[in-house]
Structures are given as C-alpha cells and as structure tokens.
C-alpha cells in the first residue's frame, strides 16, 4: 500500500507573509486578529516548480488576502482573493511561470 504524504505546517502570526520555496506543497496558516496578506512572489524571486500546491488557511479572525507579487497573475473565481472567513482555506496551484490558480473559500 502507498503511504500517504503528510503535509507540513508553516504557522504565520504577522500581518504580511511572502511565500518561500520551502512552502511548496505545505499548509500556510495565517493567524492574526487583524487583516493580513499572503503574497505569491514572481518566479524570478522564488522558482516554484509548475504544479506546486500551497494551501492557505485563515486561522485568525483577520481576513487573509492572497496578493500577486510583481508580474504574477492569480486566477480565481470572480477575481476573489480574500479567504471567506476564519478557518476558511484556499489552495494556490502554479500552472505556468508566473500564473497560479487560487481555488477554495474565497470572497
């Protein structure tokens, strides 16, 4: 039987965080009572492999917004990039050099 892959957690408590290469295929937890922003950096800064998935969870009460770094395109339903509420989540999936899908609980 294939052993399931366990996901690693990156707990963030600040109001801003920019993804790093070590976040690939991990869960990033944003835990702040104030509004906070997670930025997806351009490939020139952080060269994630195409197909990389990163789950973002809004643990705190402050709304987590997913932002595009310089030259990055984020594709989401209705262009929504704010996580829908506390304990809501979204997944960022890299589909091209500087293009990502953002799917999940977005408002």
Identify what each model region corresponds to.
Residues 1-70, 94-107:
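Exposed extracellular interaction/assembly regions and N-terminal maturation sites
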Residues 24, 86-88:
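A generic structural signal for well-ordered coil/turn residues at beta-strand boundaries
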Residues 70-85:
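Terminal beta-strand-rich extracellular "head" domains
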Residues 89-93:
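Short tryptophan-centered beta-strand motifs in secreted/extracellular beta-sheet-rich domains
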């Amino acid at each position: 039987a294939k052993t399931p892959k366990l996901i690693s957690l990156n707990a963030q408590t600040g109001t801003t965080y920019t993804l790093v290469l070590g976040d690939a295929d991990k869960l990033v937890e944003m835990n702040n009572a104030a509004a906070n922003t997670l930025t997806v950096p351009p490939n020139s800064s952080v060269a994630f492999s195409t197909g990389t998935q990163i789950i973002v969870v809004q643990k705190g009460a402050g709304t987590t917004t997913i932002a595009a770094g310089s030259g990055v395109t984020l594709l989401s339903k209705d262009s929504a990039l704010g996580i829908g509420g506390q304990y809501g989540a979204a997944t960022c999936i890299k589909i091209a050099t500087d293009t990502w899908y953002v799917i999940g609980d977005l408002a």
